[in-house]
Design a protein with these regions (language model features):
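A recurrent flexible, glycine/aromatic-enriched loop bordering the glycosyltransferase active site
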Residues: 132-156
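A conserved acidic beta->alpha catalytic loop
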Residues: 18-27, 291-297
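Short, acidic, metal-binding catalytic loop of nucleotide-sugar glycosyltransferases
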Residues: 2-11, 279-286
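Acidic donor-binding/catalytic loop of UDP-sugar-dependent glycosyltransferases
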Residues: 24, 74-89, 332-346
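Glycine-rich, basic loop-to-helix element that forms the pyrophosphate-binding segment
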Residues: 45-64
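Short beta-strand-to-loop acidic/aromatic patch adjacent to the donor-nucleotide binding site
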Residues: 66-77, 323-333
Length: 380
């Protein structure tokens, strides 16, 4: 309702994806299609959910007919004037994010405003929010920072130019950080408008399926309420992000991506420690391990269902020919500090700027070339 209430002069298509729901969502979509000629929807029948990583792209490519689209969450209330701000700031090769006004569900940050006008639709204080927001608009209409997060508005052509979200992360988690990196590498400028906002309520879905709770004092708490499904998928997606980019998700205080260089790294593991194999495999292009053929195949068999990357090409025997441009050799001794060095390797290599061989803790590092490959990741 908030989109229709507050869209102003703009003609807005609302495009919704139903991901194998069993709660009557599709019946509601059909009702809305009959009532609203600009309400459109697609249904994924399942039985397994494919997630918004896949369905956002189908909405953009198959359903939306406008040149400008916006990734928008169902738990957001569109504030008055938000679309005017997007119209004013969106230009070729830009993405505009609306500022989130949030109840205290998540850690505060400089890129959002924390104000509690309700955590669930049933307790939403709409009139109070709109009255408070008049002063915000008055003082922040021209304020803008760099950063990107939902909801974000973009030109469809810029989205399609990099082939949208990477299915590596399906059904969800880290797909947004991945596409933001790729947008930035492809020359997109990010703008966060503070005069255009949404109110963002409880994150309903796979992460907090049961919503938020308040204690007797009225304070909101979300800690330890994540579902097992979300925790498992988030771990898988994090490992896949590291496999692809060679580092954890990084951004500045306003959530603008920080993208270290991607190098061609091979790890040479001269022992039969399968736990170390599991920990180190995502942090390189190739790992040459001393475990026997049976243990190596066992690792591949167990881990392969968690990624679409071919692990048989990443996990190789210790004596295999080593063609990586950077080799990190590990013998029997390996500490948490050494693991930290591997996690920081892109920054260490960028700062060293030299080819050659050197020791770092218990690591022997051979640098044959410092070619970088992050721009090869722009298109998925």
């Amino acid at each position: 309702d908030s989109i229709r209430k507050n869209q102003g002069k703009h003609e807005v298509e609302i495009c919704v994806a139903d991901d194998a729901s069993t709660d009557g969502t599709w019946d509601w979509c059909l009702e809305m299609i009959d009532k609203d000629p600009l309400f459109k929807a697609l249904k994924w029948d399942g039985p397994e959910r494919v997630g918004h990583t896949i369905l956002y792209d189908r909405l953009v490519n198959e359903i939306a007919t406008k040149d400008i689209c916006m990734i928008y969450h169902a738990d957001m209330y569109l504030m008055p004037g938000a679309l005017d701000q997007i119209e004013h700031k969106l230009r070729d090769k830009t993405i505009v994010s609306l500022t989130r006004i949030e109840p205290p569900l998540h850690p505060e940050g400089p890129e959002k405003m924390l104000m509690d006008f309700g955590i669930e639709p049933e307790e939403f204080k709409e009139k109070e929010l709109l009255e408070w927001f008049k002063d915000v608009q008055l003082h922040q209409a021209t304020k803008a920072t760099e950063g990107i997060f939902a909801p974000w508005a973009f030109y469809k052509k810029d989205f399609q130019e990099i082939n949208g979200h990477d299915p590596l992360y399906a059904p969800q988690s880290k797909e947004d950080s991945d596409i933001f990196n790729r947008f930035q590498l492809n020359g997109i400028k990010f703008i966060q408008t503070w005069g255009g906002c949404v109110y963002h309520m409880t994150c309903r879905g796979s992460r907090f399926a049961d919503g938020a709770k308040r204690n007797p004092d009225g304070q909101v708490f979300m800690k330890n309420r994540e579902t097992d499904e979300w925790l498992t998928q988030n771990q898988k997606a994090t490992r896949n992000f590291i496999r692809k980019w060679g580092h954890f998700v990084k951004h500045d205080r306003f959530l603008k991506p920080i993208i270290p260089h991607k190098y061609d790294v091979g790890i040479v593991l001269n022992n039969n420690n399968t736990e170390l194999l599991h920990a180190l495999e995502p942090w390189c292009n190739t790992i040459y391990c001393g475990v026997g053929v049976n243990l190596r195949q066992q690792y591949i068999t167990i881990e392969q269902p968690n990624t679409i990357m071919d692990l048989s090409k990443r996990v190789l025997p210790y004596n295999n020919e080593k063609n990586n441009e950077i080799l990190v050799a590990i013998n029997d001794k390996f500490t948490q500090q050494d693991f930290g060095y591997i996690q920081q390797l892109p920054e260490i290599l960028a700062n060293s700027g030299e080819e050659g061989e050197f020791e770092l803790g218990n690591l022997n590092i051979t640098v044959l070339s410092l070619n970088t490959y992050e721009k090869d990741l722009i298109k998925c």
